[in-house]
């Protein structure tokens, strides 16, 4: 698994790109599921109007972002979907990387069951941040968990491929920050 030191890099854009191709692994209720990280978005606390911690705003919900890098920041979006972020950087520098999509690697049958995705297109199984959490069974219960534990971690192994960079999705409220190309996608089929 990746060591804690990997997550302490202050450049969240670098880490958002660097996480691509690594395998996100969960072992929850005795069931192992995993997938290659193929889409990420960087959120840079102090100066990013799309970030929950913009201008060093601190709330009960976003307080995990102020922790030392290497923990999970999971929150509810629209009160419905859990979204999984990797907290990065040193203590009190609120950066995080949203894991937007994975490519199933292990336990795909379990993911299909968790998402009730039988007889549906497999390429849509984990192609969104809420879908990732549902497929891997990540909930608010896993918020602040270390990413160096047997039940939640990211592998050292890494797949390669073509990386593209685009603006982030669904942040029209973020004024000039909405067009920053801080979304990274990995095509490992090339």
Curated annotation (Swiss-Prot):
Lineage of the organism: Bacteria, Pseudomonadati, Chlamydiota, Chlamydiia, Chlamydiales
Keyword Nucleus: no
Origin species: Chlamydia caviae (strain ATCC VR-813 / DSM 19441 / 03DC25 / GPIC)
Swiss-Prot/TrEMBL keywords: DNA damage, DNA repair, Hydrolase
Protein name according to UniProt: Putative 3-methyladenine DNA glycosylase
Family of this protein: Belongs to the DNA glycosylase MPG family.
Cysteine disulfide links: none
GO biological process, one term: base-excision repair
InterPro entries, per database record: Formyl_transferase-like_C_sf (IPR011034), MPG (IPR003180), MPG_sf (IPR036995)
Database matches in Gene3D superfamilies: Methylpurine-DNA glycosylase (MPG)
Enzyme Commission number: 3.2.2.-
């Amino acid at each position: 698994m990746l060591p804690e030191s990997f997550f302490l890099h202050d450049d969240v854009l670098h880490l958002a790109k660097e996480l691509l191709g690594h395998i996100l692994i969960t072992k929850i209720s005795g069931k192992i599921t995993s997938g290659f990280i193929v889409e990420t978005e960087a959120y840079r606390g102090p100066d990013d109007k799309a970030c929950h911690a913009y201008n060093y705003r601190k709330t009960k919900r976003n307080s995990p972002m102020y922790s030392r890098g290497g923990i999970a920041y999971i929150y509810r979006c629209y009160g419905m979907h859990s979204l999984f972020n990797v907290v990065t950087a040193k203590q009190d520098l609120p950066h995080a990387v949203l894991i937007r999509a994975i490519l199933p690697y292990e336990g795909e049958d379990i993911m299909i069951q968790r998402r009730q995705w039988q007889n549906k297109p497999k390429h849509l199984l984990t192609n969104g941040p809420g879908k990732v959490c549902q497929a891997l069974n990540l909930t608010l219960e896993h918020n602040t968990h270390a990413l160096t534990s047997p039940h939640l971690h990211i592998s050292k192994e890494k797949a390669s491929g073509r990386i593209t960079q685009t603006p982030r999705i669904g942040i029209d409220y973020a004024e000039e920050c909405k067009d920053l190309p801080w979304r990274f996608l990995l095509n490992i089929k090339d």
